[in-house]
Amino acid sequence: MTLLENKTPASRLYFQLLKLLLLSVFVSASAIAAPVPTVMVTELQNGLDHPWSLAFLPDNEGILITERSGQLRLWQQGKPLSEPLKGVPAVYSKGQGGLLEVALSPKFAQDRRVYLSFAEEGKDGKAGTAVGYGRLNPQGTAVENFTVFFRQQPKLSTGNHFGGKLAFDKQGGLFITVGENNQRLTAQDLSLHQGKIVRLTPNGKVPKDNPFANQSPARPEIWSYGHRNPQGLALNPWSGVMWSNEHGPKGGDEINIPIAGKNYGWPLATHGVNYSGLPIPEAKGTHVDGTEQPVYYWEKSPGISGMAFYDAERFPAWHHSLFIGALAQKELIRLQLDGDKVVAEERLLGDRGERIRDVRIGPDGYIYLLTDESDGKLLKVGLATNN
């Protein structure tokens, strides 16, 4: 606070007394203010090979963890990390490719179905995103009868921008993010899967109400388009609407709410530039007619990845927050939400210096993270309490 002082002696004394009074009020307020909660981190597992995704099994069966090099493992409290589960598909593990997401069927208690996304090599040596499912055996040692039901067409990647995130909506629809394989204009071509979010039934069929289901040559699986490399996908538990995030180039990481049939701009609309610092050649600005604006974006890219909405009861200070991992800036980002608006941003765990790949809310109300390193970790994160 700045006080405008008169230069007479009497007024100087008045303002000095007023300053002392205000200072005492500020000190008293700070003395009774609630302390900032301390974030507590527990390392549950290390030695993981670039872990990418995790999924909680019910009834304390453990946590499934994918490693990008092609292994699916089972972590259980108090037990050694499992050997790789059998029945997992072969993967293209070059560059950003490999075994990517693991997700459970909404009816896992009945069907024990496990979904996996991965980079799959084609006949010409290039790769694309693929998704399939199999049945986790009762022993948790194998995925049986794995069947691929979605393949990105055509396969164009030489190791970049696969997407690969999976999430179910409340109606059971399966959303899949598909990167543009670092070939920008494919994201605007509806005859290609590149740079899209697709929606399928749990059995891999095209829902009749998909926006391009009867609009050949558009791919009927497409839900939304104009995406670069979507690395986060989560259902908003309060609105029941799917949210996604994606990497920009140099700047322009985004959070979006993908709506059926809408164009999210890449590469025509972007808040980023090329890694060289030069403009994106196809870009027409940050706001382009016919494209949707992000809910939130960063001018300097954190390298956002997995994300999760905090809807648990354990830590009230985190209610109505969206947590996102940051690969480049090596932090956990907390966004405070008011409806669909971001009203505050907080950075956590930056002192650890670890690339945070996946973020999940556990059934116990703690946040679980995977760090994308050759010695990757499974972390459990919470707030210190007086309880």
How would you label these PLM feature ranges?
Residues 343-363:
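Conserved blade-ending motifs and adjacent loop-strand segments that build the rim/top face
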Residues 130-138, 190-202, 258:
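Beta-propeller blade signature
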Residues 16-29:
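Bacterial N-terminal signal peptides
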Residues 1-15:
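N-terminal secretory signal peptides that target proteins for export/translocation
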Residues 85-95, 146-159, 202-223, 267-298:
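Surface-exposed loop and turn segments in beta-propeller and other repeat-based domains
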Residues 34-40, 79-83, 136-147, 205-219, ...:
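Beta-strand initiation motifs
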Residues 120, 176-194, 252-254, 258:
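Short, conserved, GDST-rich strand-edge loop motifs in beta-rich repeat architectures
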Residues 33-184, 232-235, 240-248, 300-338, ...:
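Acidic, Gly/Ser/Thr-rich repeat motifs that build Ca2+-stabilized beta-propeller blades
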